[in-house]
Amino acid sequence: MSKLIFGLLLSLFLFHPKNKLPDSKLAKDVRVKVWPKLQTELTGKGLNINSAVYLRIFKDESVMEIWVRSGRQYQFFKSYNICYFSGGLGTKTRSGDGKSPEGFYTITPAQLYPLSSYYLAMNIGYPNKLEQLKGYTGDEIMVHGHCASIGCYAMTDEGIEEIYTLVYKNFESGRQKIQLDIFPFRMNQEHLTKYTTSSYLPFWKSMKPGYDLFEKNHIPAVAAIKNRGYFFQN
């Protein structure tokens, strides 16, 4: 093999092509406004937006956390308050039930909405593969701006500006997906005991191993399907 061909193959192996991302003047203007601040905050914590990003939501706290990979593990970057979600605790199962999903989701570049009726938005990927297997219905479930929603997670315009920009910049670096895990609460025994009478308890217990793996290793658990339920591995 010639040195030229070897060099070309090596460059293709080492460098991911940049994603073709949906964009708008609004999203560009937002990036100009908020990215310098976010970049300074990332650098101050020794983090790089080119590294993998992980998102997780806790409904009962109305909070979204953003974690960024640093070495082998992920490090907490910052959190954002959720202004509104509908339906309380418990996951979405059908279109029109007014519930906001709980589970393990994947966001890809194609799921960005740079110009939305809710300012900026990203589709969370509901229903996921397990939910499709169970026949759950509904679509267009978003994390978006404003402070009103049915089935989505409304972060305010100020909040979504930063969240959307971080996600966009991560995809711009060549990343192909971002994991979003949505929990009803922190899955410790205290909370599970508090909700022992809930009809959702079996489902929540099925989510707990994924939560526990991240708490132990600070590496997002990979959710697979086994016996019509979640199965986890790192």
Name each model-derived stretch.
Residues M1-K3, G7-D23:
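Bacterial Sec-dependent signal peptides at the C-terminal "C-region" and cleavage site
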Residues K18-I150, E158-I178, M187-N234:
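Cell wall/extracellular polymer interaction/catalysis modules
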Residues M155:
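A conserved hydrophobic position in a structured secondary element of the catalytic/binding core
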Residues D181-F183:
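Short internal beta-strands
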